[in-house]
Amino acid sequence: MVSVVGEMFCNPYTTELVVRRRRESLKRERYDVFDLSNNLIFTVDGGIWNIRRKRVLRDAAGIPLLSMRTKGLVPMRYNWEVYKGDSTESDNLLFSAREPNLLSFKTSLDVTLPPDQSSTDISSVEPDFQTFGRYIGSSFKLFEPIHNTLLAEVVHDFTWGGLIKGSYSFKVRVNPYVDFAFVVALLVITDDTSNLR
């Protein structure tokens, strides 16, 4: 079982989701996450132009499940930290994600769970998970690198009209016993990183 946010987000069957992104204003964007029956599962909101690009993933009732933000004010590469709830305390760190290569045109991330020791420097730690993206859009596959196990796949439904309007969607397929809240958080981070290229 791959449980990062919580076991309640690990289904014993393949989970398929639809994620719709829309720009609410020049400063804010929102992601709505639905199951295939069109039931709202999560929302993600946050500012595009705030200093740390903070995003909050909430359940359908509006309760914060996790918060995402960039590490540092002007990063050379995009480093993200993800915390439980609306916290930014180091003891609530769920995982960190960073681009493995600054000069790559593909959107890929190395994802690291917090180390057992008190140090939060993940620069020399091997990633626990990796995403591999495409050259265009925010599609990616999530792998567990030691056994090269595919955990999830995200497909960006790219259209030029959606790009101009600032709204588009994703299809998400998460394998059994894999935390789908974790995958949605990686989708938001990947999309944000891809949009800044």
Swiss-Prot record:
InterPro entries: LOR, LOR_sf, Tubby-like_C. Disulfide bonds: none annotated. It holds the Pfam family LOR. SUPFAM superfamilies: Tubby C-terminal domain-like. Belongs to the LOR family. Might be related to the phospholipid scramblase and tubby-like superfamily of membrane tethered transcription factors. This is Protein LURP-one-related 9. It comes from Arabidopsis thaliana (Mouse-ear cress). The lineage of its organism: Eukaryota, Viridiplantae, Streptophyta, Embryophyta, Tracheophyta.
